[in-house]
């Protein structure tokens, strides 16, 4: 049937031609343009196989190809080039179940591959809902790069699924060495309004380097590393790396014991380590063997690692993280790090990790302005920038950002069996005016508390403690914020423990003084006992105290080398006896002279010096006695585990106190912080009999003068210090003596 006549045709005396229905093109020009620009929000509606009145239309994106065919049941069907690297044709197969794409490149090989645009999304509706609500605690199971293997009619298909959150992006494409970093073969689809983009790329497997080419809302195109990359290139290279894991863990018994352990009522002596400078040149597996041997011989219960999440700048010590889900490639693969943790667990050593959720660097290839807008960072510079460090601050009030961080905590615990997280820079998170002068914005109540950060920290601790009893969370928090280690159900932040920065500052300041002046500052050494049970504390002498001109424990001590060594030993004995767990940075356990530098190893040669070797021996014995003596750790968090004997003898610079164990044990700890010998210092004691000298830091084995009590002191019926009996104790200058009470 002909169409209606056009009056214009009659005017010109022309006979109208029959009108035919014009067939639609195999690809709409708008789709071609969007695919070419990398800004198509749903390329899967164009590419792949789709129903057609004459069968099935197959569209393939193969820029630079000379010929493209579709192989169905062993028969190749050629596709036509329709422009912009897209090839298409209608195949006479109404129900096309499976096929392969055959691509010929000029002067190159013929490549046969499955079509990634035929596969369904790897995230379900529940996943997307939980991400939007900020409640997907296993976020790493669905975002990031995951090697997969599918069974199809034409055989198995291996590849990698990629998924990334970028809600304001105009388009996202996976680029990598699989496509020569061209960025025009793997456009991703936006999954509804979730902000998640996803694609499956066949024949891409472990070891493939990749990034996301993000067309931002600001009009810029930036190649970003994957926020959930599980492995990375070796810095300074910045690509993410596809990886899987086939590691078989051997620490089931360790994890079972951990679940039933209360860390606050258990011994905890922590050796803080920077892996790159402990013994330079070692990988994770070599470090595991050598570090485990060292730590076990020294008697520590745990190691705490400066951040191992990937960071491009070594001089940041790991505190400017760009890949929160990837152990640094400097020392090996993720499975190598798993082996590191597993080996330490096998040696009876827990592994704590320094974790940095407060801020992240501005590198544009990482998290910064990820989709062309402030995405992970708070949009208001008064809240979103940390001026002191030149970094961005996470937007803790945004569901997806909070989810990213909370899930990351579970990731390290579940994927790498980490025993605890030391949370860095908590004070900077809690206060809106932290280091901001007058340029800060109050909260909705007009206060300076960051309510979103408080909610995040509470959620973090609730999630970790619910999912993994026995795992510790430790706050580096330097203010008097109340209830840092109290339960969230009573308004606290929910941390297991908190660093006692006040103890560290006061103690190091006191002992840096010449002994002749210490009596005028006696309150500095006693003040920490006023608030010792207000929180569950860790006493830290960390990396921060041995850098930037602060000196070391050795150089802080007054006097000649003999006096310095005595001062270090006395300090450590005081630290181990004080209520709270203890953390000591590497090198300080043998009194290293030089400040720490991440660019060089420790000065192990100093152990050839008897004084430095003596400090190391003293630390070994401190740990041995500490672990064997419940009085020193079982009641750290209750005043019932402590009592003063002598707090006020400022003239002779002597302190003495009792520690009580939940098993009924009692230890008296006596300290002489003067430069004089107190040959017969009388100490009041609660129990009559022979008290065993279980530690004396002036022992000759430690490099001391050998002043001691011959292993035992005997009480006399002389009331003293409000106690029914007493004994005289020989106290060398700058020394500590621990005495164990007789047991009934």
UniProtKB/Swiss-Prot annotation:
Domain of life: Bacteria
Swiss-Prot/TrEMBL keywords: Carbohydrate metabolism, Glycogen biosynthesis, Glycogen metabolism, Glycosyltransferase, Transferase
Pathway annotation from the record: Glycan biosynthesis; glycogen biosynthesis
Positions of the catalytic residues: 424 (nucleophile), 476 (proton donor)
Region (Disordered): 1-23
Annotated catalysed reactions: Transfers a segment of a (1->4)-alpha-D-glucan chain to a primary hydroxy group in a similar glucan chain
EC number in record: 2.4.1.18
Top enzyme category: transferase
A cellular component term, taken from the record's GO annotations: cytosol
Keyword Glycosyltransferase attached: yes
Name of the featured protein: 1,4-alpha-glucan branching enzyme GlgB
The species this protein was found in: Nocardia farcinica (strain IFM 10152)
